[in-house]
Amino acid sequence: MATTRFMARKSTLASLIAMSLMLSPAFAEEAESEEAAEKGYAELIADLAAQEGLFNFYRNTDSGETMLSLREEQLNTPFIYHAQTMDGVVEAGHFRGNFRDTRLIEFRRHFNRIEVVTWNPRFVFDENNPLSRAAEANRSEAVLAVLDIEADDNGRVLLKADPLFKSQALHRIAPWANPNQSGPRFSLGQLSADRSRIARERVYDNNMDVVVDYVFLNEEPVVFGSAAIADPRSITISLQHSFIEMPDNDYQPRRDDPRVGYFTQEFDQMTNPEWAPWGDVINRWNLVKQDPNAALSEPVEPIVWWIENTTPHEWRDAIRQGVEDWNIAFEAAGFKNALVVKVQPDDADWDAGDVNYNVLRWTSSPRPPFGGYGPSLANPMTGELISSNIMLEFVFMSNRWTLGELFSSGAALGDYHNFDDAHMYCSHGHEVQMGHMLGRLASDQRMYDDIENDPILVQALRHLIMHEVGHTLGLNHNMKSHGLWDNEQVHDAALTQGVIAGSVMDYNPVNIAPVGKAQGDYYSYKPGPYDLWAIEYGYSPALDDADAEEARLQQILSRSHERELAFGNDADDMRAPGRHIDPRIMTGAMSSDPVAYAIDRWDLVNHEFGELLDKGREDGQSHQRVLTSANMLFGQYAGQATVVSRYIGGVYVERAYVGQTNDVRPYTPVPRDTQRQAMQALNNYVFAADTLESMQPVLAYMQQQRRGFNHWGNNEDPRPHQMILNMQRNVFNHILHENVLQRLSDTAMYGNEYSLTDMLGDLTGGVFNGTHTTVSQNLQIEYVNRLIGIAGLEGGSGYDNLSQAAAVGQLRRIRNMSAPRRAGDSVSNHYGYLHLLIDRAFEA
């Protein structure tokens, strides 16, 4: 009896254990998998909504779960993968239309699973070279995801799609940690797969788009972000994953060359013994003539641009003109009507994010990351362009301040051009907006209700569109093209005729005429000579014979040394202190004599400060226009100080090849007279005791319009001493940079006649010019502290020996200065403090 009861209990216990195992997640999942395997392909998709095309995509309309189906022949075959932000928050590096990632991926079968693999195709081996057998040595592919095969029959494999798309397997959405950034930073937190969702999918014959709303959770945020974020504990980023079939056409890649500026696909030729074993190709569209024998022919397939239906009607003509004017350049390459513009119908059944369409898109963001942005998608193997978008922000058309904290509040003059993807990011829209504000102020114009009556805005919009379209054609920035005209010619509209620089890809300031001079063109709104030349190189049809084609390309490139074809991109420009060497490759510069142009701009700003109270105030309005205009004027003044400073210690760079001209010299130090002219300009306009004295009558009116409690905790009074000192510091950051001081000595060995001692002597003379104001006293203390740091008297110094010695010499010179007779207490105290700083430094 006892045995029977024991056996009964044992049987019951076994049953409970079995039931618990069946109910456990692992066992249930295994059972479900076995059940699915038994069902087969047809049965698994029987009740699912289907979209068929490149891949087949299935969705359970009750649960929302998704599945993906591939043909067997699509396995081990490369596809182009592309990630694009549909909507996001700027704090996390996301914004609508942001092209984020393009790579090759393959779906590879490994027994009962599919591996999603990516690799870097840049390393190229000659198949006939025995080294090609070791082509995979010391390289790492990346397995992004592993997916179980749910069914496999009739030449197709079926996979669950949710694990692939509701994770960061294909693309990292959260920003990478930046080891160089100190202090707290904005964080998305952790991805929540449960709250994320596959929002929509579009399946076509040659591509598939899957849009996923990724939800990140951060229960204890440290940095809350802007008002664009409803609640920093839960943030949604909408991202589109695109899979594109490799193009199957007769596209012929074109090689890159350092003398012309295109975006590229880089290839290292691993078996090539040449000095520069690179096989880089440029990004460009596949344009083919309808009539190959005609000098000018329409393309078989033009580049079609769509104006998004969100675009205000009154802007559309200027936008269309900005796109179509590129056809002028394409005629130099033998194409007529290479670009065509259409308008997206209001009832269009396609989305502007669809990679099958090139769309000019408009947004008005709470925190605009740009004025214009023109990314493109290229085949990583060939450089063939496949798709593009242009994102434009309404803020470019407005009077809104977009550069962060106001300068009048003490904001430093940082390099707001910097961006994680510097080669793709374009901040030119910000420059154009500030220029538009200056142009309107200088001409005493208010905002027009009708764009046709606003010549500044029409030219600015056409220019910005041309600039961003240029990026989508494959073109880099060209920060060296501003020297097309001299300082007089650039203001002559009869001469410039819409071309004030060699390229629309430059970052030129708005071209406002000096006081008393007739106004010329405000912007370049037609392609310049560099643009025509670059398009000819990139898009003119190739010859059939390889040797003849190479000779043809060399003939085009042999003109690169011509002044109107000058080129230098972001990798050369000097916008950041101490970085790069050629002052002619610089944002914000204009004319072949940027120092003279800067002096004209400084005089203009001083003039406009004198008239700002008359122009900037309106009855019944706050002083917001005065405040914003004053900050804009100050930014223009400071920007030209930056431009001029780059000539000191500069070196002209020439990338012409050997034999291209009679005397090809890659590096030529800036002439002594030019460097001295730049230093004299800085001494007169930036380091002078009366610098920006014209701003003083405006200071009492630089009041920000109150909004709720937004200014709580911050004093609202302007800080002119801090403003001016920040500008002066920004100049010091360059001309006293360790790279610049050492280059002044190094270049003396190959032609520089403006020595380190000369430069510091002129600088000291400008800073201590005999006139005493609180502005000059502020500057002198800053300068002495800089010299002490260079000399390393109070700690280590990263400067070379010659620079340290020169700094000591200037400190001794300053120590021998004294307050003038009958100087007031302020001046006497000031010199006493300077002597104390120097004495303590030497004693240390």
Where in the sequence are the language-model features?
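N-terminal secretory signal peptides that target proteins for export/translocation
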Residues: 1-8
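Bacterial N-terminal signal peptides
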Residues: 14-22
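Sec/Tat signal peptide C-region and signal peptidase I cleavage site
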Residues: 24-28
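Auxiliary tRNA-acceptor-end handling modules of aminoacyl-tRNA synthetases
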Residues: 29-311, 329, 333, 344-452, ...
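Soluble non-cytosolic domains of exported or imported proteins
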Residues: 61, 73, 98, 276, ...
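Sec-exported extracytoplasmic/periplasmic mature domains
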Residues: 324-335, 365, 470-471, 475, ...
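The catalytic-center signature of Zn2+-dependent metalloproteases
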Residues: 343-363, 369, 459-514
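Conserved catalytic/binding loops enriched for acidic/polar residues
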Residues: 452, 456, 481-844
